[in-house]
Amino acid sequence: MATRDSGGQSQTGRSQQGEEIEDVTTEASAEAAERHAEITEDVDDLLDEIDSVLEENAEEFVRGYVQKGGE
């Protein structure tokens, strides 16, 4: 009968571990989603800045790019 008691305790421990893992995973997912949103916003800002430079003086932008080794 001692085996049954420890088996029940083991299962309880496993379910608690599962809940802890799920909580950590949920927190990590929320942090990843927040970081993804920040990066997306930064990329959008950078693309907007490039667009405005190109609208103002595309020829100068291309010359500068080629001089730096771009093709």
From Swiss-Prot:
Keywords of the record: Coiled coil, Isopeptide bond, Ubl conjugation pathway
Coiled coil: 29-60
GO MF term list: proteasome binding; protein tag activity
Cross-link named Isoglutamyl lysine isopeptide (Glu-Lys) (interchain with K-? in acceptor proteins), sites: 71
Region spans: ARC ATPase binding: 27-65
Transmembrane regions listed in the UniProt entry: none
Biological process, per Gene Ontology: modification-dependent protein catabolic process; proteasomal protein catabolic process; protein pupylation
Ranges of biased composition (kind: Low complexity): 1-18
Any Pfam family: Pup
Top-level division of the source organism's lineage: Bacteria
UniProt-annotated stretches for the region Disordered: 1-42
InterPro entries assigned: Ubiquitin-like_Pup (IPR008515)
Pathway noted in the entry: Protein degradation; proteasomal Pup-dependent pathway
Described function: Protein modifier that is covalently attached to lysine residues of substrate proteins, thereby targeting them for proteasomal degradation. The tagging system is termed pupylation.
Family of the protein in this entry: Belongs to the prokaryotic ubiquitin-like protein family.
Record NCBIfam families: pupylate_cterm
Recorded domain comment: The N-terminal unstructured half of Pup provides a signal required to initiate unfolding and degradation by the proteasome but is not needed for pupylation, while the C-terminal helical half of Pup interacts with ARC to target proteins to the proteasome.
Subunit: Strongly interacts with the proteasome-associated ATPase ARC through a hydrophobic interface; the interacting region of Pup lies in its C-terminal half. There is one Pup binding site per ARC hexamer ring.
Name of the protein in its database record: Prokaryotic ubiquitin-like protein Pup
Organism: Salinispora tropica (strain ATCC BAA-916 / DSM 44818 / JCM 13857 / NBRC 105044 / CNB-440)
